[in-house]
């Protein structure tokens, strides 16, 4: 009897403690309008980014639909749901989520830490791999304050990507932010998988944003592989989820990378794709009434891109780093697409994949002439730079005169540079190609370049 009474009193104490944490009054609003992607509610005063739940009737049961405040007009809140809203009725109750005992809303907290390694999560931190939720007590806010640029460590160390053309001809530094510009079907995902497997980094964070669901599974199981997945965290927000969840997925992947950087680790962040992130913001902005600008993209899109990209890079002196590769989809291989143009301006370099090379069976289909690494000159030696310059000159000379050479219209001796390019062309072309399962480290990449050009002037 005494044991039962003690247990009952303990349960009562726990219940009272939980009750004390609840706000005295739970306020709610009402749903007044649903137009396209946006729901309107009245009766609540909440800040931008606040999380709400909307009651949805399913027969005799009541379910909750999570949403976020994306705008307001007077007393009306504009809500963007994170899931399907079918079945929501006019006048449905809308509650604020994460309300403290004082009646204030706490910010959204998502799981962080080493327990995330090897896991596949969605943009809200929920598992997609069929395993339980990550066993971690570490959480963090989705958005962090801007990094003081004067406290960043300069880009001083070479990052070995394991891909020969990138290592030697487009050298990337640790903490650099690169764009991978490509149309559809030119080997973009395969190249990302090679970098994920072969890059010398402590942790890899992959954000698959707005891609087809089939491609997400294929990338994780076949392209990333067991070797890459063991040291990776994958955040997947495919094309069929809410645009808000797609944007949150990109921000969450970046936040995880920041967390590992703050722990002193060197992180490789792969974001596929930055264009889908911009398209998600376009959907949200147009839905709440923001006027379109260039090619239908509202001005807020071009403000969101640098805000996301600037979070990557080196940390403070002696700390970790985030080297980021963002894929940018070029519609019809148009390099002047507004998102491609904006990304080119805010990134530290770009790697362009060529459809012509891909159709010719040349992989990776990197267009060396159209690509550049802005940090390269500060990372390589004078001899290395001279070899790269000679390589590009010969490559450009051959490409300009390819048709003349092919039909036999070129007379040998007319152009010494072209003569040398023709003689070395098999070696140049072979150097630019690499098998999917072949790893070319930094030292081997330089040695291959030296074999083509033993002496440089």
Swiss-Prot record:
Catalytic activity reported: ATP + H2O + 4 H(+)(in) = ADP + phosphate + 5 H(+)(out)
SUPFAM superfamilies named in the record: P-loop containing nucleoside triphosphate hydrolases (SSF52540)
ATP-binding keyword on record: yes
Residues that bind ATP: 182-189
UniProt record similarity statement: Belongs to the ATPase alpha/beta chains family.
Record-level GO cellular component terms: bacterial-type flagellum; bacterial-type flagellum secretion apparatus; cytoplasm; type III protein secretion system complex
TM regions (residue ranges): none
EC number: 7.1.2.2
Protein name (Swiss-Prot/TrEMBL): Flagellum-specific ATP synthase
Compartment annotation: Cytoplasm
One GO BP annotation of this record: bacterial-type flagellum-dependent cell motility
Main location per the UniProt record: cytoplasm
A GO molecular function held by the record: identical protein binding
SMART domains: AAA (SM00382)
């Amino acid at each position: 009897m005494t044991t039962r009474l003690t247990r009952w009193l303990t349960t009562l104490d726990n219940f009272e403690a939980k009750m004390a944490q609840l706000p005295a009054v739970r306020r709610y609003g009402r749903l007044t309008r649903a137009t396209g992607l946006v729901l309107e509610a009245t009766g609540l005063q909440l800040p931008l980014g606040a999380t709400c739940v909307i009651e949805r009737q399913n027969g005799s049961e009541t379910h909750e639909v999570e949403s976020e405040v994306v705008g307001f007009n007077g007393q009306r809140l504009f809500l963007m749901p994170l899931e399907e809203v079918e079945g929501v009725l006019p006048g449905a109750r809308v509650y604020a989520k994460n309300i403290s005992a004082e009646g204030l809303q706490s910010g959204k907290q998502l799981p962080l830490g080493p327990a995330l390694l090897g896991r596949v999560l969605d943009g809200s931190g929920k598992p997609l791999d069929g395993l339980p939720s990550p066993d971690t007590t570490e959480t963090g806010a989705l958005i962090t304050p801007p990094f003081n640029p004067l406290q960043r460590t300069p880009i001083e160390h070479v990052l070995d990507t394991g891909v020969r053309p990138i290592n030697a001809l487009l050298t990337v530094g640790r903490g650099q932010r690169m764009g991978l510009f490509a149309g559809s079907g030119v080997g973009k995902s395969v190249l990302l998988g090679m970098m994920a497997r072969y890059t010398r980094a402590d942790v890899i964070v992959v954000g698959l944003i707005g891609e087809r669901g089939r491609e997400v599974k294929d990338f994780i199981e076949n392209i990333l592989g067991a070797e890459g997945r063991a040291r990776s965290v994958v955040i997947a927000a495919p094309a069929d989820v809410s645009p808000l969840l797609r944007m949150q997925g990109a921000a969450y992947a970046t936040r995880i990378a920041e967390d590992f950087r703050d722990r002193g680790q060197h992180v490789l962040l792969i974001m596929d794709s930055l264009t889908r992130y911009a398209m998600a913001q376009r959907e949200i902005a147009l839905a709440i009434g923001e006027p379109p600008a260039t090619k239908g993209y509202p001005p807020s899109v071009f403000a969101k891109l640098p805000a996301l990209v600037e979070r990557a890079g080196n940390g403070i002196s002696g700390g970790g780093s985030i080297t980021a590769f963002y894929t940018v989809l070029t519609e019809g291989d148009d390099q002047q697409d507004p998102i491609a143009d904006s990304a080119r301006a805010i990134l530290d370099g770009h790697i362009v994949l060529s459809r012509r090379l891909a159709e010719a069976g040349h992989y990776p289909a990197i267009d060396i002439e159209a690509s550049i690494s802005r940090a390269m000159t500060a990372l390589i030696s004078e001899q290395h730079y001279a070899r790269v310059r000679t390589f590009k000159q010969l490559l450009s000379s051959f490409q300009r005169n390819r048709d003349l050479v092919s039909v036999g219209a070129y007379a040998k001796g007319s152009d010494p540079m072209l003569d040398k390019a023709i003689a070395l062309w098999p070696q140049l072309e072979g150097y630019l190609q690499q098998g999917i399962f072949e790893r070319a480290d930094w030292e081997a990449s330089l040695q291959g370049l030296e074999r083509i050009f033993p002496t440089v002037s």
